[in-house]
Design a protein with these regions (language model features):
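A structural signal for well-ordered alpha-helices, especially hydrophobic packing surfaces
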Residues: 2, 14, 38, 42-45, ...
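Amphipathic alpha-helical segments and their boundaries
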Residues: 2-41, 82-101, 120, 124-168, ...
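Transmembrane helix-loop junctions in multipass membrane proteins, especially transporters and channels
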Residues: 11-15, 52, 181
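Alpha-helical segments in soluble extracytoplasmic regions
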Residues: 53-81, 183-209
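Transmembrane helix-bundle signature of multi-pass membrane transporters/permeases
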Residues: 63, 130, 192, 254-255
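Extracellular/periplasmic ligand-sensing ectodomains of membrane signal-transduction proteins
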Residues: 53, 57, 87, 101-102, ...
Length: 297
């Protein structure tokens, strides 16, 4: 009986009101830190999505991963604390958060894997940089040809003018393709590009096939410029198809945002529950825990 009394007395000492208040405060602080780290991870992820360079994207992505790692570390520590003593409601709320956080991590992993690629930004840079220059060189060569051969046969002029017009259409189709998220819509755009490409090639090949134009420097320049443009267009379409910037932005604004709110709501509910848990009072005199009446001496 004495052993039982000592054990109960020891337990009460271990879980005194002051100590339970300290545990409650520590758990509340842990949940608060989880909420802050979760918000920091979300902000860093958004910065990674919106960054325009690979290096900046990687820097922000690393910050997001570090913040989510902190959330996970705190979640495990809180789980260990709950295993020692916690109400079933607290454990259930932590389990709810854990499920939501697992989904958050899955989305985060897929999203951050996209952010460092910046394929849409690179496609735009090619389209408005080297590709635009190659198209301009081709157009200028055809303009010189038309001015120089203004009195030539109508068929010859139509070949040059047709190639020039098709090139302009083809060039203007690139930016909408880069900004498009739908694969079927991109298929339609590429079909129109292929049609324009065939017309440009038909015009240039038709000019080069004429015996008196085989040595024409402007025709040669136009064909060389269009060859460079075609190579760049292939690269642009490949980058555009990956759509890493648009896909990561869509995920950030939809799936990630919803997962973030789910986790924050779960943590808020858990924080409220921890604060609401009652603290049992310890006996004022542990001697009263002994069994039987005091018999005196």
């Amino acid at each position: 009986m004495l052993v039982l009394v000592l054990l109960v007395f020891h337990y009460q000492r271990e879980r005194s009101p002051a100590q339970q208040i300290e545990i409650k405060a520590r758990r509340t602080d842990m949940v608060g830190r989880m909420r802050y780290a979760l918000a920091a991870a979300s902000e860093a992820e958004k910065s990674a999505v919106l960054a325009v360079t690979d290096q900046d994207s990687q820097t922000f992505a690393d910050q997001a991963r570090a913040a989510t790692a902190e959330v996970e570390s705190l979640r495990q520590a809180l789980g260990e604390s709950f295993a020692a003593s916690a109400s079933q409601k607290e454990k259930d709320l932590l389990a709810t958060f854990s499920r939501g956080f697992a989904n958050f991590l899955r989305i985060d992993r897929d999203l951050l894997a996209l952010t460092g690629k910046n394929t849409n930004i690179k496609a735009f840079a090619l389209a408005f940089g080297p590709a635009a220059q190659a198209a301009q060189e081709t157009d200028s060569a055809l303009s010189r040809f038309l001015a120089k051969h203004a009195t030539s046969a109508q068929k010859t002029l139509l070949l040059a003018a047709g190639a020039q017009a098709a090139l302009l259409r083809l060039e203007t189709r690139l930016p909408p393709h880069i900004a498009e998220l739908s694969d079927p819509r991109m298929d339609e755009m590429e079909a129109l590009m292929d049609k324009d490409d065939r017309q440009v090639r038909a015009g240039l090949d038709g000019l080069a096939a004429q015996p008196d134009l085989r040595a024409d420097s402007d025709v040669a320049s136009a064909r060389a410029g269009y060859a460079r443009f075609s190579e760049l267009r292939t690269q642009i379409l490949a980058l555009s198809r990956q759509n890493t910037n648009l896909r990561s932005l869509a995920m950030s604004l939809d799936q990630k945002r919803k997962a973030m709110f789910t986790c924050q709501d779960a943590l808020h509910a858990l924080q409220q529950q921890i604060a609401a848990e009652p603290i049992p009072e310890a006996p004022s005199n542990p001697r009263r825990l002994s069994a039987g009446p005091h018999t005196g001496y």
